[in-house]
A protein has these predicted regions:
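Hydrophobic core segments of transmembrane alpha-helices in multi-pass, intramembrane catalytic enzymes
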Residues: 34-42, 131-137, 183-192, 241-250
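Membrane-cytosol interface segments of multi-pass membrane proteins
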Residues: 1-167, 176, 211
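Hydrophobic alpha-helical membrane-embedded or membrane-associated segments
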Residues: 38, 69-73, 77, 163, ...
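Alpha-helical transmembrane segments and terminal signal-anchor/GPI-anchor hydrophobic tails
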Residues: 174, 187, 203-264
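Loop-centered beta-sheet repeat module
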Residues: 159-200
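Hydrophobic alpha-helical segments of polytopic membrane proteins
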Residues: 147-162, 194-220
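Structural signal for the C-terminal ends of transmembrane alpha-helices
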Residues: 48-56, 86, 142-151, 173-174, ...
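Cytoplasmic juxtamembrane interface segments
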Residues: 48-66, 71, 181-182, 240-243, ...
């Protein structure tokens, strides 16, 4: 059995902490937003395996796994929040004074939207990325399944080209102010593919090299943080080149001393 990569567990934990801080009015939220959610898209791609798409049975198992891990938690969590919406208002848990009580019709409509992945609740607004990650994972797997008989390099080139095309489509739509539901599927697909290739071609380095990478990544992020931003939830970013800083942010998170520390 392949040994569990504890370093990636730590990195996932760091990502979760950054998301919590980002939604808790932490002073450096703008800095975290440059890369905190991207970590999860990259990690999802990092753990994608060829065995998931070697035949129809494996592909079906992979899809069911994603339904279990992404779709079901999203639906259950948000439906609970819909049902408790009026209770939350009475308990004054919302800071929005204009938040409305739900009628029976409102509850039904919102539950249907949640089941169809077409909306979530204010209380669990941070779960917006789960549908995006779900569809990216499925689309990536379907494409890999379709090209599974091609040579390894050919498959990699196809995915790289598609990633760039998807990013271009997303960017054009944004520039034309066409903010479609789920448009982040186009713009975040490239991160999933990056994670996959990072796992394939990862290079082991010592603590000195990791420290150098950490410092360089941090400096780049600090500089970019002064001149622009990224808001994946709204699919907004200063420039398409700012996607580079998301990958730099991943390197920054991965090369810090916490993730470089080897647990016994």
């Amino acid at each position: 059995m392949k040994e569990r990569e504890k370093q990636m567990d730590v990195l996932r934990g760091i990502g979760i902490i950054l998301i919590v801080l980002g939604h808790a009015a932490f002073p450096y939220t703008h800095f975290f937003y440059l890369f905190h959610l991207v970590i999860f898209f990259i990690l999802a791609g990092y753990f994608f395996k060829e065995e998931y798409v070697k035949d129809k049975v494996c592909l079906k198992k992979f899809i069911m796994l994603k339904i279990k891990r992404l779709y079901v938690p999203f639906v259950i969590g948000n439906i609970i929040c819909v049902l408790l919406n009026n209770v939350f208002i009475n308990w004054k848990l919302y800071d929005n004074i204009n938040h409305n009580y739900f009628t029976v019709k409102d509850i039904i409509v919102n539950i249907i939207k949640i089941i169809l992945f077409r909306g979530n609740t204010e209380m669990l607004g941070a779960t917006w990325f789960l549908p995006i990650l779900f569809f990216i994972s499925i689309i990536y797997a379907l494409i890999e399944f379709a090209i599974r008989n091609y040579k390894k390099k050919t498959r990699e080139y196809i995915q790289i080209i598609l990633s760039i095309i998807f990013l271009g489509i997303g960017y054009v739509l944004i520039q034309k102010n066409i903010n479609l539901l789920g448009i982040q599927i186009f713009t975040c697909y490239i991160f999933f593919n990056f994670g996959r290739n990072f796992n394939k071609y990862k290079i082991k380095s010592n603590n000195v090299i990791n420290c150098i990478k950490f410092v360089i990544s941090f400096v780049i992020l600090v500089i970019l943080n002064k001149y622009g931003d990224i808001e994946l939830a709204k699919n907004e970013y200063t420039n398409i080149l700012y996607y580079i800083c998301s990958i730099v942010g991943y390197r920054f998170s991965r090369n810090n001393y916490l993730t470089s520390y080897k647990c016994s």
